[in-house]
Every structure is written in C-alpha cells, then in structure tokens.
C-alpha cells in the first residue's frame, strides 16, 4: 500500500539495508502505511535483503520479499520528515535530510551476525524482529493518535 505524497515521510536507516531497516519498514508500513510514507535505506547498502529477514517477517504475515537494498543517497533530494536509525554505524553516517523534523536512534542488534545452528540463527532473527516490532508498533500507535487529534484529521 502506497501512502499519498501528502503523508509524512519516514526513512529508516541502517548500514547495510539488508535486515533491521527492512524489518522495521515492513512492520511500520503494515501498521501505519495509511498515514505514513515509509522507506528504508543504508549508508553502505549490501545489495540484497537478507532471506532470514524476509522469512521471519513472513511468519507474522508481512511480505517484504519485493524490497530492495537502497542507498540513503537516493533520498537526499526527498522531503523526509523523520529519520530513524536502527544501528550504531548508520547513526554516525547519517546526513541531515531536507525537511527533517524528527530524528531518532533506536539501536537493535544485527541478526546477520548471529552464529550457531540454522535454528539458533532464526531464533536471533525472531528476537530482533520482536524488538523492532514492539518499538515500531508503539511509534505507529503514537502517530495514529497524533493524526486522529490533529485539527485537519
């Protein structure tokens, strides 16, 4: 679902744009895509979306299989209202975006660095997904509350 251009734009940044930022984008778009235009990008994009990130979001009914890894430079000429960084490296490499009103840094462990058996790695992806989901569902609920109480709503 694509939001109208008049909705506030949220850009979720991570270093590689392969795991955390895509999970956050999928979750936030599913929860608030009707009131927010949600994108993700990376300061050093990996060029792919991690298959386990796709798999653990599918487990909760969110399809990010069509997502692609993008550079934050692709958004420098966009009117971004909020930038949310989800890993430490992106916070230092994040430029000031035009029109940016809000900036948040919510660090999450990188599940791509998980080691162990296939199941242990999936457990780590699920743990990080659940942390991201809790944070971004709360953000979506707050955005909906603000939207419903604004004079133009």
Predicted segments, located by residue:
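Conserved active-site segments centered on acidic
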Residues: 1-73
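Short coil/turn segments at beta-strand junctions that form active-site/ligand-binding loops
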Residues: 8, 80-81
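S-adenosyl-L-methionine/SAH cofactor-binding core of RNA-modifying enzymes
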Residues: 65-80, 89-91
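Alpha-helix termination/capping residues and helix-transition junctions
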Residues: 4, 77, 97-100
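Phosphate-binding/catalytic loops
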Residues: 91-153
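Redox-cofactor binding/interface segments in oxidoreductases and associated redox assembly factors
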Residues: 85-86
């Amino acid at each position: 679902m694509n939001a109208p251009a008049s909705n506030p734009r949220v850009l979720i940044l991570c270093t590689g744009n392969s795991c955390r930022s895509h999970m956050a984008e999928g979750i936030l778009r599913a929860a608030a895509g009707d009131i927010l235009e949600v994108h993700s990008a990376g300061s050093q994009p990996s060029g792919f979306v991690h298959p386990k990130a796709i798999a653990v979001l599918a487990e909760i009914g969110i399809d990010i299989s069509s997502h692609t890894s993008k550079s934050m430079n692709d958004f420098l000429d966009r009117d971004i209202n909020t930038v949310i960084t989800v890993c430490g490296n992106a916070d230092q490499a994040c430029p000031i975006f035009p029109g940016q009103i809000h900036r948040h840094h919510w660090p999450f462990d990188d599940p791509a660095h998980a080691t162990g058996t296939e199941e242990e790695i999936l457990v780590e992806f699920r743990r990080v997904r659940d942390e991201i989901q809790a944070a971004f569902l709360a953000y979506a609920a707050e955005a909906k509350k603000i939207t419903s109480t604004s004079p133009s709503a």
